Amino acid sequence: MIRILKYGEVANDEIFARTESAINVEGVVSDIIADVRKNGDAALYKYCEKFDGAKLSSLAVTPEEIEEAVAAVEPKFLEILRAAAKNIRTFHERQVRNSFIINNENGIVIGQKVIPVDRAGLYVPGGTAAYPSTVLMDSIPAKIAGCREVVMVTPPGKDGKVNPVILAAAQIAGIDRIFKVGGAQAVAALAYGTESIPRVDKIVGPGNAYVAEAKKQVFGQVSIDMIAGPSEILIVADGKTNPRHAAADLLSQAEHDKMASAVLVTDSEELAVAVQKELEVQIPLLERAEIARTSIDNNGKIIVAPTLSLAIDIANELAPEHLELCVDNPFDYLDSIRHAGSIFMGRNCPEALGDYFAGPNHTLPTSGTAKFSSPLSVDDFVKKTQYTYYTVEALARVAEDVAFFATKEGLTAHAKSATVRLEDDK
């Protein structure tokens, strides 16, 4: 049963405690990466058979396989995927940054170029569930950014095939190439390249502890989006909130995995007790009841705060991945929210809207990193470079100042480089 904690009656350490993974996979992942770097495709085939139970003759998904998969998906779901993709595109198109140039008409031009990364790599998990939503959320921003190529990796089933809904989403998103490989070995292949899989410049997408560790280890060789921790939801709710709705929203994250975190912060002790009871009613009805039960019992909590203002302060300190504001006039509180991955406003905005359909991205910072990190966006798939142009007359006006500055830092060659051109012109 979920715990109820009264703020001020328990230690702050208990209020702000986070789910932490005890699994250490650093050594195993390091060995896998080294194997893929050395043996390329041969290592990937080996790991596909070992971990996925699939004996493959080719890593690449063919156009025929994609068409066959799309034909196998029910038409209603294809319509929903296309509608979701449209919403995601509409939102992310507003994120596009433009290059700029500043010409002060005194012989000086400075500017900034916004340039997409050449090739982006998308990791899509397999395992206990298929996530076509991840395909859309992680690839559409890359396509909008203008990446020359978007490559996807995802583990196959034992039959050597990729889940049809994953391939259907990939076709809708316009992904260029797809490969049947998952786990740390897939991350290694994207980072270093193999005979079949091209090296990418950016790797994005969630995964298990092995995938997260692999992304951590290859960072620097390649850019990554973030190191994702367990899924999180925090609901700030007043006494008018329907406890059935609050419990359902908590369970929407608790069913993800046993390490997921579900937290309710409320100024109503009556709501706290009602939600606690409602969770016990709803959990046995879930298909993933065992996972949700473990998550709620081990990592869930209901915090009773004296005021909604303090509830907001608690939310800011926890900086959750998903934050629901189940209160009257939620926009009155928006300016007070400083740290959250994504905010869901009002009583009619379950977090599931953001997971699938609304348009804002669902790849979000976890484990408190929303204090300094942002959701996945078009920005993740571009880089910026800057440029400077001076005429000889413009240089002459500032060369002595530049030289003086450089000399103060003890870099006389810097100083000379600023003045030598003027000496040549005498």
Model segments located where?
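N-terminal Rossmann-like NAD(P)+-binding subdomain of aldehyde/semialdehyde dehydrogenases
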Residues: M1-D118
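Short acidic-hydrophobic, aromatic-tinged amphipathic segments that line or gate anion-handling sites
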Residues: R3-G8, R177-G182, I302-T307
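Flexible, glycine/charged-enriched surface loops at secondary-structure junctions
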Residues: R97-I102, A260-V265, L285-I296, C326-V327, ...
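Conserved small-residue-rich beta-alpha loop and adjacent elements
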Residues: I102-A168
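Conserved NAD(P)+-binding/catalytic subdomain of aldehyde/semialdehyde dehydrogenases
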Residues: G174-R244, A248-S252, H256-S261
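A conserved active-site cap/scaffold subdomain adjacent to cofactor or substrate pockets
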Residues: M226-N298, I302
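C-terminal core of ALDH-fold dehydrogenases
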Residues: N316-K426
